[in-house]
C-alpha cells in the first residue's frame, strides 16, 4: 500500500471553478466529492500499474465511489469508521477521540484538544460492540492504530524524547491490550496489571506518565490519594 491522503479537502474552489463545474457536468456529477473520487481513482490506477494499492483517509470514501481495493484510515470519528466498514472498505480504526496520542490527557496538561482530552482509561474503554460494529463490519476491520503527529514532537525541544514517552505511555499499553483481547475484564483489573509494568518501563528508560492523584475536600480538609 501507498498512502495517498485525501483528508480535509477544501472544495470551495472546485465549486467556484468553471472548469471543475464543466467537468462535473460532462460526467453527470452533482456532488463535488465526486471530483475527489475522480482524482483518487486516477491515483489508484497509477499505483495499480506499479503493483501497489492506495491507502486513504476516511473522507476519500465519503461517496463510496472508490474501489474496495483501498485501505481506509478512519481518523475523524467512530462514525467515520462505522461508515467505511459498512460500505465494505477494509479499515484501520484510529478515531482521534480515542487514539490520537498528541491529545492532552487532562485540561491542564500539554497537547492538542480538538479531538478530545483523554488518558489511558478512555483508550481502554473503546469497545467495538458498544460502538455498534456488526459482525460483517468487523470483518472489514484491519486493526487499531494509535497516532502521534510529528509537529507535536519537533516543537518540544529539548525534551522531545521524554515528551513522546509521556504522551504515548501508558496510553499505547491500553491500546495494545484492547487490540489483543478487548476490555472484558474491566478497567480496575487492567489497571492493577498495568501498574505491574511500571518497573519494567522504568528499567527500559521509558518516561511514562503517572495518573494524577485524586483530591477530595470535606469539612475543611483536603485529602490526596495517589492513583499510582
For each feature predicted by the language model, list its residue ranges.
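Active-site neighborhood of glycoside hydrolase catalytic domains
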Residues: 1-70, 75-87
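Flexible, acidic glycine-rich loops studded with aromatic residues
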Residues: 53-62, 66-70, 74-220
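Aromatic/hydrophobic beta-strand junction motif of beta-rich domains
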Residues: 222-227
